[in-house]
UniProtKB/Swiss-Prot annotation:
The gene is cbpD1. The keyword Transcription does not apply. It comes from Dictyostelium discoideum (Social amoeba). One of its GO terms (cellular component) is nucleolus. This is Calcium-binding protein 4a. Residues 10-45, 46-81, 85-120, 123-158 form the EF-hand domain.
Length: 162
């Protein structure tokens, strides 16, 4: 997954390029007319539809203009939703190890999960030790959903809650 920083940099650059290409009055925004002219110049099949769709999606203050911040804000919401969905799937997949369904994974549950997943006993112990070393942030010998979520955010460099 792309980091939030990379996502915002790419998005900002692309939006700035689009605004630069179509901004006729130099206000660093694209009016409805400027958007229409830009898409007409690029030979979009239906520039009116594209213009109206973009304004509907991204013109958050409904002033009839698009700014870089409006596009970033609108898309960041989608990014956060996707990141949260991926995090939930990741945590849920690991929490299959929680055999007694108490919302905590013990070392024994982790070891057994790795055995059930095809590891031999020695490998399962190594994997369980590694998992607890990396994820059990409060050293209470249990892994919670929140610890696993925080680990995933750091490990995969995604920051959906910032």
């Amino acid at each position: 997954m792309v980091t939030k920083k990379e996502f915002l940099e790419d998005l900002t650059n692309a939006t700035n390029e689009m605004i630069k290409a179509g901004d006729k009055n130099g206000d660093n925004q694209l009016s409805k007319k400027e958007l229409y002219e830009l898409f007409k110049k690029c030979k979009y099949p239906n520039p009116t539809l594209v213009t109206n769709s973009l304004l509907e999606l991204f013109d958050l203050d409904k002033d009839g203009k698009l700014s870089v911040n409006e596009v970033k804000t609108a898309l960041l919401v989608d990014y956060i939703i996707e990141a949260e969905t991926c995090l939930k799937k990741f945590v849920d997949s690991i929490f299959k190890a929680d055999s007694n369904k108490d919302n905590k994974i013990t070392w024994d549950e982790a070891r057994q999960f790795f055995v059930t997943s095809g590891s031999n006993e020695a490998q399962a112990k190594v994997f369980a030790n590694s998992m607890f070393e990396d994820v059990d942030s409060d050293d209470d010998k249990c892994i919670t959903r929140e610890e696993l979520r925080e680990y995933a955010i750091e490990y995969y460099e995604i920051y959906p809650t910032e």
